[in-house]
């Protein structure tokens, strides 16, 4: 039987593979020595295929090593062999809890490289889609987080409201998860008749539900004890590790791309950016609660001012003509053939575009050598970056705190591993 690992040996462990090898048999480790615990890659609280290697001294964590990559699909390499519009469905599978928001950011990145400005109506509809995705993502994150911390009933409240949003998304896009709603230069279809009124009705009944959900958690002693002063991330650490989204703002850093670097006309909307003061799990929870209210505020303004007009740019090289025209006119038939076989003709150049997604800043860095296929596409995943701070904040906490800290970061492995 292998000998237990001493404190001195632990400090010399060079990498994850060595940790795994040396932790194969620790059942006979003498008292006072440390233990390696494999959490995952299949564990309920990770909400995805994610492994966390924990070094324990009793119940106290002394070292943490996140192990990612189990859900790697090679999305960036796939993009190099696909036309720009063909890659839209792959963005659904990044943060699959907010596919609409992924669609929007990717389309904006390609349009920035093309130098296109989409019509005002399409911009407003994209804002609506992004904020609906933010609400649905936060509902999922908060419900699962509460359940992980022992408040199972809250999960039922959040999922009931999330289902209402999915019904609206399904009516708009034709799908609940794999929406693929955007196209380079616009959208696949316009708003269905009566859809905006349904969304207004949802917002009206949803705001009291947010208060109800908050009431079930904010004054819940068990939830408060498990989240307050747990997993504290200072402003300096949040910035140094490149955190974005609610995890950054929960530490009190006022950074929101919708305010700092407005896109899609976000500068026209009146909304607040909620901030935390301590940077603990509770602050990150409160930021997401308030963000849902602010998203409803943005949606109200957007629904009140949806301009008429087209939903796509007037660029024949980038958009399919109407089917009726393809069947009757030679020019439209040729245009249809070129767009389908060659894709959008993007000029040579490189561009980065980042959008404020529910998990943080989702960015696309695209290099083009001309033509309809990118030379290189790099995805800036907020979940991947946010997970990088775990080795910093987990040591010193109890093993029971790990679940609360992981849930407060609200990561999704489809986007992290891509």
UniProtKB/Swiss-Prot annotation:
According to its UniProt record, the EC number is 7.1.1.-
Keyword Nucleotide-binding appears in the UniProt entry: no
The question of whether NAD is a record keyword is answered with: yes
Q: Where is the protein found, in the record's own terms? A: Cell inner membrane
- What are the record keywords, sorted? Cell inner membrane, Cell membrane, Membrane, NAD, Quinone, Translocase, Transport, Ubiquinone
Q: Which domain of life is it from?
A: Bacteria
Purpose of the protein: NDH-1 shuttles electrons from NADH, via FMN and iron-sulfur (Fe-S) centers, to quinones in the respiratory chain. The immediate electron acceptor for the enzyme in this species is believed to be ubiquinone. Couples the redox reaction to proton translocation (for every two electrons transferred, four hydrogen ions are translocated across the cytoplasmic membrane), and thus conserves the redox energy in a proton gradient.
NCBIfam families given for it?
A: NuoD, PRK06075.1
Question: What is the similarity comment for this entry?
Answer: Belongs to the complex I 49 kDa subunit family.
The subunit field of the Swiss-Prot or TrEMBL record says: NDH-1 is composed of 14 different subunits. Subunits NuoB, C, D, E, F, and G constitute the peripheral sector of the complex.
Q: What is the protein's name according to its record?
A: NADH-quinone oxidoreductase subunit D
């Amino acid at each position: 039987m292998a000998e237990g690992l001493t404190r001195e040996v632990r400090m010399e462990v060079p990498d994850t593979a060595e940790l795994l090898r040396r932790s194969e048999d620790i059942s006979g480790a003498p008292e006072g020595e440390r233990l390696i615990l494999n959490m995952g890659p299949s564990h309920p609280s990770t909400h995805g295929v994610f492994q966390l290697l924990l070094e324990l001294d009793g119940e106290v964590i002394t070292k943490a090593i996140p192990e990612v990559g189990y859900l790697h699909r090679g999305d960036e390499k796939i993009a190099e062999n696909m036309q720009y519009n063909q890659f839209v469905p792959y963005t659904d599978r990044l943060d699959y809890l907010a596919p609409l928001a992924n669609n929007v950011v990717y389309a904006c990145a390609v349009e920035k490289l093309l130098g296109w400005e989409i019509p005002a109506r399409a911009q407003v509809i994209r804002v609506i889609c992004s904020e609906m995705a933010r609400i649905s993502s936060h509902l999922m994150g908060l419900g699962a987080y509460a359940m992980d911390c022992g408040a199972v009933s809250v999960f039922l409240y959040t999922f009931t409201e999330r289902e209402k949003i999915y019904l609206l998304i399904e009516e708009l896009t034709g799908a609940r998860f794999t929406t693929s709603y955007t196209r380079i230069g616009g959208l696949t279809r316009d708003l269905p008749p009566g859809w905006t009124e349904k969304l207004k009705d949802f917002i009206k009944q949803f705001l009291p539900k947010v208060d109800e959900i908050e009431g079930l958690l904010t004054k819940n002693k068990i939830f408060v004890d498990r989240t307050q002063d747990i997993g504290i991330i200072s402003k300096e650490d949040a910035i140094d590790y490149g955190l974005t989204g609610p995890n950054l703002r929960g530490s009190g850093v006022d950074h929101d791309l919708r305010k700092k670097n407005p896109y899609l006309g976000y500068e026209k909307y009146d909304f607040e950016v909620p901030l935390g003061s301590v940077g603990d799990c509770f602050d990150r929870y409160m930021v997401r609660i308030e963000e849902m209210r602010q998203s409803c505020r943005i949606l109200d303004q957007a629904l009140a001012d949806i301009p008429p007009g087209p939903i796509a740019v007037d660029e024949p090289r980038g958009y399919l003509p109407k089917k009726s025209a393809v069947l009757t006119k030679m020019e439209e038939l040729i245009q249809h053939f070129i767009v389908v076989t060659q894709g959008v003709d993007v000029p040579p150049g490189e561009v980065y575009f980042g959008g404020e997604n529910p998990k943080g800043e989702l960015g696309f860095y695209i290099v083009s050598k001309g033509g309809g296929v990118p030379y290189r596409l790099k995805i800036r995943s907020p979940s991947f970056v946010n997970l990088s701070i775990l080795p910093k904040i987990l040591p010193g906490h109890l093993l029971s705190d790990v679940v609360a800290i992981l849930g407060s970061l609200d990561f999704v492995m489809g986007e992290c591993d891509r």
